[in-house]
Amino acid sequence: MKEKIHPKYNTATNVICACGNTFTVGSTKDNIKVELCAQCHPFYTGEKRMVDTAGRVEKFRQRYGSKT
């Protein structure tokens, strides 16, 4: 492997969820922000709630307008 071309690997990268939960993982990034984690995802919590903030179709309709 070539030397001095690989990114620096951080063993303590903070992952911050939108729900406020934080945990530490290893990554090449300093901080990672996510929308869902195991503490708030409906699959893990058993709650039924809408997760999608804006789907692809809605984004397309906002950008180009609905023809129907």
Swiss-Prot record:
Cofactors required: Zn(2+)
Any one GO molecular-function label of the UniProt entry: metal ion binding
Binding site for Zn(2+): C17, C19, C37, C40
Record note on cofactor: Binds 1 zinc ion per subunit.
Entry keyword annotation includes Metal-binding: yes
Keyword Ribonucleoprotein appears in the UniProt entry: yes
GO terms of biological process kind: translation
Top-level taxonomic group: Bacteria
A GO CC term assigned to this protein in UniProt: ribonucleoprotein complex
Gene3D superfamilies given in the database record: Ribosomal protein L31 (4.10.830.30)
InterPro entries: Ribosomal_bL28/bL31-like_sf, Ribosomal_bL31, Ribosomal_bL31_A, Ribosomal_bL31_sf
Keywords, in A-Z order: Metal-binding, Ribonucleoprotein, Ribosomal protein, RNA-binding, rRNA-binding, Zinc
Similarity comment text for this entry: Belongs to the bacterial ribosomal protein bL31 family. Type A subfamily.
Protein purpose: Binds the 23S rRNA.
Complex and partners: Part of the 50S ribosomal subunit.
PANTHER family xrefs: 50S RIBOSOMAL PROTEIN L31, CHLOROPLASTIC, LARGE RIBOSOMAL SUBUNIT PROTEIN BL31C
HAMAP family cross-referenced by the UniProt entry: Ribosomal_bL31_1
Name this polypeptide is given: Large ribosomal subunit protein bL31
Natural source organism: Dehalococcoides mccartyi (strain CBDB1)
Gene name per UniProt: rpmE
